Amino acid sequence: MMDLSSKDALSDVLKDTHAQSSDPSLWAIFGHQSSDNVHEGGNESVSVEQEIFDLSQLSERPVSETVSKASIPTNINGLSQVKPSALEKSQEVLSLQKLPIKGRRPAGRRGRPALNTSNSLERNGTRYVSAEAPISVKSSIPAIPRVTFERLCYESAIASNLPPNALSPLEAEMLSEILENPTWLSLYLSIRNGICYLWHRNPTLYVSFNEALGIVREKKAFPLASLAFEFLSRNGHINYGCIYIISSLKLDESLSQKTVAIIGAGMAGISCARQLTNLFAQYEQDFLSRGEKPPRIVIYEASERLGGHIYTHMVPLSDNEVSEKSSLATTVNATNECMVNLLTDSLIGMPTLDSDPLYIISSQQLSLDAVHTRNREFILHDIENGRIDTEHVQRIFRLFDALLFYFNASASKQPLHSLITPPEQEFIQKLDQIGWYISIEAFPLQIKDTLSEFLGNSANTLTSLLHLTVLDLKIFEWFKEYLSQSLSVSLENVYPGSIPNLNLLLGENVASYSFKHGMADMLNSLASTPSPLPILFDQCVHTVKLEDNTVNLSFVNETTVSVDKVVICIPMDKLNTHLITFEPPLEEKKLKAIDRCHFTNVKKVILIFKTQFWEPNISIFGSLPQDSGRNFIFNDCTRFYEHPTLSVFVKVEGIDFMKDDDIVNGIVSQLKKVYKPKSEAINPIRTIISNWENNSYTNHSSYQISNLFLEEDYAILSEPIDNTVFFASEAISQKNSGSIRGAFDSGILAARDVLASLIGNVVLPNTLVIEENLEQPRKTYGTKRNAQQALGKEGERENKEKRISYHTEYLRLRQKRLDKEQQECDLLIAELLGPSPVPPSRPSANPYLLYQKTQWHVCKTLADQDKQRVTGDPEARATKNEIRAKLGKTWRALDSLGKQPWVDEINARRANYSTRLEEYQRQINSYNVRVAQIKSEHQRRCESQPIPEDEAKLKLLAEQEDEHLHPEKEGMSVENSDDDYHDDLDYEDSISEVFPDNFS
């Protein structure tokens, strides 16, 4: 490490700051706060003559000067753009008139107030559907083939994290009772998917209500479109993020206005505030109909910056510290600055980038400069034997990823397709792709209580089955350590189902993204676009007191504010401490749920170098675990920071006694062991360490579900208090807990609940679908005939299309019933017989391919030696083509006796394949016989049941419709008949059956 100053100068700079290290290249983040040398502004650094930087001296506000000024609202109770003192801000902004108490309202669904509100149709002036409605059907449907449009709608529903062919759990809770009719349900899903298409077609523009109604094809479906639009808008599936919603209403300044306070300016608080801004603009008419303006939003942040755990800092570099080969030196108008993230460097698109709302906001709405990565390149070194072959490492990685998939899939609730294709069979298929085979009849893996125990037992079991070597097990242990560092938690604390997207963290083709100007750039843009959110810094709330329908907030600066709604967006562990006091206190069940949350701490060490000495274009590298000493895993951040940079995550547990410079020395020492020939270049010019545990407001780096956490704790943590105090945190999100995405989702859901408490839940209309009168078909047909006479040939063609609607609807409903019966039959087969036997994979018939697979490492060593001898470079490595050429040359050099071992192995595999194929044929024949029996019995049982009433009614109407369409059949004469001649005896027999007594 570089010595940049003398000992005396060091003591002068760190006087009374209690910095954790005296190393000039070491920055202690979040140490003891000091008021000396505080520099106002955004991501600007403190200039110190001795070139020692202590981030505890920095102002924590990373927002640019323009954004920070715009963050303070104007024209609200006389607020000024100049930063006032805390007392002045409290007196000017927070002195709100106490709103009149309106009393408690009757509770509605799930204990929420049953307010009298209108649905979307009524708000927009369409209380019923008529021919004079100003909204045009099909106006939002693009001029593309219908098959293409339906495919786009299907993909858009998936991108909105909704099942395209079924109701989501929230939709089922709201609409399952009123959408019992399969026809209505199918129509609703098609409309809902179409609205999702309108949003994902261009998420920079919000989807208006009239545009959503234009997705329907008939006016009778307008109420369903209204419901779908309400659900998608309120739950944040559409119209989220940085969108500008035009308001055409004139607000009366004399109207009253409520206030919604948000405590905390992290990702949860900013996303909640931005979503509330969008919702209040969309539902402006609802508030005006109540005689009030849309509520104002105020965000209170205890620190001097926004972001919480999202922290980006600018590192200044001198000219001689920037290498000519780095991207900083080659960028036009580039400054000698390096933006580093103190926690998360990248976000994972879960499950894909198209379905990640944060990626949609950052890439399409904000157009931030993103860096994409898809495949993780792992480079491992053996300190004694050098670098390990990449394909060897990748093979063990795919085995490790398959184990994570099986652990995650077995613990979750399986849908229909997973019952037919269970995790065991998919795991076997993944191994078969790698080149290993195990039998499903003797499946060896068993789910254990923790992930650590599962991986340990699986490694022991698979060692004998797959003939894993000692090197394979060392690589496997390295991946276990990497997963533990990625999760920031010990694998002993990860139990089945605790991390829903566990297999995506190490996925082979999972896309991730970051931002060149730091992760805070996304949050700052979200807070300032399209209009700045009103954020007040240095406002630490210590008491939340509920009185009737209002909330009194008391701050540490002895000011008090009365608001109508409060959203608590601070870390969950702070609710169980004395940082914020609740009056009345929180319920015991909520406190117990908070105790079951698990918060961990890690130190992130960032090393900036002048030149890059490690392999380019890689993601992660490290060395195999040693018998003694701590093993570090290095993340290449060069593509993020545009300068040669490595980051290392170090667990705080067990190293509390170590100083920061000791940790850095250990990391640099391991780097020098891995890259011995380049040890002289391994000298960082800057070192940054994050110490989150020393921060008063975010004294942990990550959140993780403990093994004591219960599934119902999610609902307990998010449950509001008296429909007035709401909660949002990364711990509340069930799908993405402990992540930035989870904090964003919790803010969206909290905004939904706040809106429902202000204007009420979605009001279900009395009639979902305005249908034709089905009980008087003859009158309807008569009306159609009159219309046909009035309209002529064009009306005849149009009414003819309407006449076949009953027949088409009957066929569709009948086919849906048959599909449901087939689905039930498949489930029954899966439950009784299990999955279908898997055919054995055909072995290779070429002995050279087997030789190539087994002798790759030997020929690679020979090719490397040849390359080093020719080039004279002891570090030279042969390319893949050169290794393949060496393989072919050595194979051709072998005689028939030398090739015989591989030929014998191929013959043995063929014999084994023949035996397995015969066994498979026997099993599949027996399986097919049992399947045919089950299908026959199931079909007989279904045919014995009566046809559903709706289908029977449509069948009758279809038959009547067919009679009206072909009336000539009834009056067909004998001369015009094409039927064959019938014997008179048949005619007499039919007459005798009708008149048995009187006929003779």
Curated annotation (Swiss-Prot):
Cell location: Nucleus
Cited InterPro entries: Amino_oxidase, FAD/NAD-bd_sf, Flavin_monoamine_oxidase, HMG_box_dom, HMG_box_dom_sf, Homeodomain-like_sf, SWIRM, WH-like_DNA-bd_sf
Primary localization class, coarse: nucleus
Region (Demethylase activity): 279-950
Annotated signal peptide: none
Disulfides per UniProt: none
The enzyme's E.C. designation: 1.-.-.-
GO CC aspect terms: chromatin; Lsd1/2 complex; mating-type region heterochromatin; nucleus; pericentric heterochromatin; subtelomeric heterochromatin
Cofactors, names only: FAD
Enzyme class: oxidoreductase
Coiled-coil residue spans: 107-137, 434-529
Domain SWIRM span(s) in chain numbering: 153-249
Protein name: Lysine-specific histone demethylase 1
Organism: Schizosaccharomyces pombe (strain 972 / ATCC 24843) (Fission yeast)
